[in-house]
């Protein structure tokens, strides 16, 4: 069984993380480990109709963001890596500066030190120079910066289409193949 850590921070776009968990429920060989910041809980209630209970039920394992002794806080716990979707600037800053004040940033720090993939879906705009420098520093220490920027070549017809394309592309970063792609991939002109 492959394990993927899914982090949801307080940035706008909680629906991306929720959809990722929903999609991974149908992937038999991937076990999801969810950690949500306190701010993520608030964003979830402000932006979606999903309850915290529903989101937790979508994950195979849920970790309390305050539990720094959780399995995902150790490098000996084998995982494919971690995605933080969405990733707030606060979370990005904590990761870059190794400020592991909770499980979300601790798990990310562990993934980096173990040289496993860490995908940060930074959800902020516009960006000032400090934000850009943080993203550069994160990339320099091994993270993949992957803002949830929609593509339009697949001609999305709904918000779900836009979300699905991003979720599918995030899973590509971990070489997780879905039974069926969530969007039409570019085949050339």
PLM regions with names:
Residues 1-119, 123-189:
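A cross-family phosphate/adenosyl-ligand binding-site feature
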């Amino acid at each position: 069984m492959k394990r993927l850590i899914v982090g949801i921070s307080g940035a706008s776009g909680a629906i991306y993380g929720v959809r990722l968990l929903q999609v991974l429920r149908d992937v038999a060989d991937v076990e999801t480990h969810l950690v949500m910041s306190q701010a993520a809980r608030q964003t979830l209630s402000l932006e979606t109709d999903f309850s915290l209970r529903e989101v937790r039920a979508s994950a195979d394992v849920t970790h309390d963001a305050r539990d720094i002794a959780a399995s995902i806080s150790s490098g000996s716990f084998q995982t494919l890596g971690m995605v933080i979707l969405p990733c707030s600037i606060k979370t990005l800053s904590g990761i870059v500066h190794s400020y592991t004040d909770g499980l979300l940033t601790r798990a990310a720090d562990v993934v980096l030190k173990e040289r496993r993939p860490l995908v940060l879906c930074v959800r902020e705009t516009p960006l000032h120079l400090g934000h850009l420098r943080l993203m550069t520093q994160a990339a320099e220490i091994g993270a993949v910066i992957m803002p949830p920027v929609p593509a339009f070549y697949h001609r999305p017809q709904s918000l779900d289409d836009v979300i699905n394309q991003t979720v599918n592309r995030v899973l590509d970063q971990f070489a997780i193949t879905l039974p069926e792609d969530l969007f039409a991939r570019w085949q050339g002109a």
